[in-house]
Amino acid sequence: MSDILSELHQVLESRKGANPDSSYVASLYAKGLNKILEKVGEEAIETILAARDAEVSGEHQALISETADLWFHSLVMLAKLGEHPDKVLAELQRRFGLSGHDEKAARSGKH
């Protein structure tokens, strides 16, 4: 899985200097971080709605599609801020095997 994330990150990086008229990602970069954050929020809401619909209908394709959109726009956000998706994967790896309660307490400084 990390291979596709790294490949996508390379494409996102290459779009930073591209003409905004030639690429959707370049147009997002040109519009700035607030536009990218707006898209992340929009995709998060669409993912939530798709999950609710999937629970009722049993059909999960829209949920998968919306989750892909959310991940994509989150990767655009990370790239805009100079971060690589490997850092997110490393954080997930660090948390793996930890109790959710213990991990949350560690983040908030509560033990």
From Swiss-Prot:
KW Amino-acid biosynthesis (keyword) present: yes
Alphabetized Gene3D superfamilies for the sequence: MazG-like
GO biological process, one term: L-histidine biosynthetic process
GO CC terms in record: cytoplasm
InterPro entries: HisE (IPR008179), PRib-ATP_PPHydrolase-like (IPR021130)
Top-level class of the enzyme under EC nomenclature: hydrolase
Compartmental location: Cytoplasm
Main location: cytoplasm
Keyword Repressor assigned: no
Swiss-Prot/TrEMBL catalytic activity: 1-(5-phospho-beta-D-ribosyl)-ATP + H2O = 1-(5-phospho-beta-D-ribosyl)-5'-AMP + diphosphate + H(+)
Pathway: Amino-acid biosynthesis; L-histidine biosynthesis; L-histidine from 5-phospho-alpha-D-ribose 1-diphosphate: step 2/9
EC number: 3.6.1.31
Any one GO molecular-function label of the UniProt entry: phosphoribosyl-ATP diphosphatase activity
Membrane-crossing segments per the record: none
Keywords: Amino-acid biosynthesis, ATP-binding, Cytoplasm, Histidine biosynthesis, Hydrolase, Nucleotide-binding
Domain of life of the source: Bacteria
Family as reported in the entry's similarity comment: Belongs to the PRA-PH family.
Name the UniProt record assigns to this protein: Phosphoribosyl-ATP pyrophosphatase
Organism of origin: Alcanivorax borkumensis (strain ATCC 700651 / DSM 11573 / NCIMB 13689 / SK2)
